[in-house]
């Protein structure tokens, strides 16, 4: 088996007489996905250099040289002039090589004291995820804003509400749109709650047992924007439940968008005819000239399966690892980086799609009473007249059966037909057999009455603004 050169430049080569085989190195190398951590490596290395200095392990001059070298390395990473070589095993080795190239081995070689790749990567990955979820949160707030803006533009439009995908009761279009905003708000709450657990720094935990060099994990944690340092060095280096939790939150965002996407796909069909897609957010067919396809919504629905798969795969990776660190954990980053990348594609696309929808409110209004959606209003009118609901439910169902037999709506039943079902069904019941009356009567908190929906929208917008303010506040000063 061919060898991959020597271990010169590797972070672990002293114990070995030769380098890894080509196949071993190909399996081991991770710079193609962990290079996203390079900017965070610079930040953490600067903080680590300062605690080495505070512990008397770096002179003033060496600290200045090291910080200048790290700053230059950070600039070179940012502008692309420094990157990993084919011989670099991972981001950590590449970045140490870059520092030594800039400050020399005498100073650059001192930085590794008191830290392991185990605590280093756990810290850098947390830093990356904290920034990434804030970017996702901004995208979610923009989608919520698109939903509430459309809701505010159609305050009185009535549509069929459905359960089991069957006609149920009339609701306001604004109520339906805001129903999609609510789970997205909860997703933002999940992001912020996740961040509380992400804000614990593993730095200073070493390989698993901590450090004997009397370094200061709390100082590093504070400089890197963490709320605290980890309480248990074994757990800090070996746990990735923060990653699986992030994978869940990201997948849940996709699932919530997929439900919205599913409705958009249905609504733009001729059978529904509720909406027209903007040309900029739809595609055509290579053979059927008439087609206008909801590709944004379909890709959202399809990519959601990908994010669910990322979550399932990561959980499977974590399920049977003994303490402490195991190389299996190298597999933690790709699923999360991919899920973030997919949401960064989907969120602006779905926001653009929603914000440019044209609603056929006349069509929605026409279909709102179809399927006898006012049957519950008839039954509840009887309840208000003192009839037990069991009897009212039976009477309303009987009215539906008669109307179905005649092929008419409930409001088209004659006074005699209503009274024949139950003498307590007087002509006054007709006051509630309108979709406007049905909507207006649902005036309790959370209901579909116009005033309640407007209040809901105000609360959504207020919460959304608070989440946006959090998401746009930098983790590190």
Curated annotation (Swiss-Prot):
It catalyses: 2-(N(omega)-L-arginino)succinate = fumarate + L-arginine. It holds the Pfam family ASL_C2. Keywords: Amino-acid biosynthesis, Arginine biosynthesis, Cytoplasm, Lyase. Pathway: Amino-acid biosynthesis; L-arginine biosynthesis; L-arginine from L-ornithine and carbamoyl phosphate: step 3/3. InterPro entries: Arg_succ_lyase_C, Argininosuccinate_lyase, Fumarase/histidase_N, Fumarate_lyase_CS, Fumarate_lyase_fam, Fumarate_lyase_N, L-Aspartase-like. GO terms for molecular function: argininosuccinate lyase activity. GO terms for biological process: arginine biosynthetic process via ornithine; L-arginine biosynthetic process. It comes from the Bacteria. It is found in: Cytoplasm. Its EC number is 4.3.2.1. One of its GO terms (cellular component) is cytosol. PANTHER family: ARGININOSUCCINATE LYASE (PTHR43814:SF1). Belongs to the lyase 1 family. Argininosuccinate lyase subfamily. This is Argininosuccinate lyase. It comes from Corynebacterium efficiens (strain DSM 44549 / YS-314 / AJ 12310 / JCM 11189 / NBRC 100395).
């Amino acid at each position: 088996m061919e060898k991959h050169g020597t271990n010169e430049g590797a972070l672990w080569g002293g114990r070995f007489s030769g380098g890894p085989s080509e196949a071993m190195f190909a399996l081991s190398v991770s710079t193609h996905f962990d290079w996203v951590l390079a900017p965070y490596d610079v930040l953490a290395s600067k903080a680590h250099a300062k605690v080495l200095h505070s512990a008397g392990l770096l002179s003033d001059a060496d600290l200045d040289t090291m910080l200048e070298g790290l700053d230059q390395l950070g600039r070179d990473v940012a502008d692309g002039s420094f990157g990993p070589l084919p011989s670099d095993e991972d981001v950590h080795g590449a970045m140490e090589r870059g520092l030594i190239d800039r400050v020399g081995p005498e100073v650059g070689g001192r930085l590794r004291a008191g830290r392991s790749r185990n605590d280093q990567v756990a810290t850098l990955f947390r830093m990356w995820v904290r920034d990434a979820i804030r970017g996702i949160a901004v995208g979610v707030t923009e989608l919520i804003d698109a939903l509430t803006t459309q809701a505010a533009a159609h305050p009185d439009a009535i549509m069929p509400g459905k359960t089991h995908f069957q006609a149920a009761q009339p609701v306001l279009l604004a109520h339906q749109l805001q129903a999609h905003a609510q789970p997205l708000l909860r997703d933002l709450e999940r992001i912020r709650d996740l961040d509380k657990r992400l804000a614990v720094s593993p730095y200073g935990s070493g390989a698993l047992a901590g450090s004997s060099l009397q370094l200061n994990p709390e100082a590093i944690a504070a400089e890197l924007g963490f709320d605290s340092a980890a309480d248990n060095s074994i757990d800090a280096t070996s746990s990735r439940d923060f990653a699986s939790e992030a994978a869940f939150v990201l997948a849940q965002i996709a699932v919530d968008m997929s439900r919205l996407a599913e409705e958009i796909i249905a609504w733009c069909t001729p059978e529904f005819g509720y909406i027209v897609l903007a040309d900029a957010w739809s595609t055509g067919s290579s053979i059927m000239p008439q087609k206008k396809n909801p590709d944004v919504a379909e890709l959202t629905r399809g990519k959601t399966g990908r994010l669910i798969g990322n979550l399932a795969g990561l959980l499977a990776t974590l399920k049977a690892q003994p303490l402490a660190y195991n190389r299996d954990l190298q597999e933690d980053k790709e699923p999360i980086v991919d899920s973030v990348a997919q949401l960064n594609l989907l969120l602006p696309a779905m926001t653009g799609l929603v914000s440019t929808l044209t609603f056929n409110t006349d069509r929605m209004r026409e279909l709102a009473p179809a399927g006898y959606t006012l049957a519950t209003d008839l039954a509840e009118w009887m309840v208000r007249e003192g009839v037990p609901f069991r009897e009212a439910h039976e009477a309303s169902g009987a009215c539906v059966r008669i109307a179905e037999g005649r092929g008419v709506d409930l409001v088209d039943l004659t006074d005699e037909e209503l009274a024949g079902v139950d003498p307590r069904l007087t002509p006054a019941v007709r006051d509630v057999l309108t979709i406007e009356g049905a909507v207006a009567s649902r005036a309790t908190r959370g209901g579909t009455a116009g005033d309640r929906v407007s209040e809901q929208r105000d609360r959504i917008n207020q919460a959304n603004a608070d989440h946006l303010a959090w998401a746009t506040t930098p983790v590190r000063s």
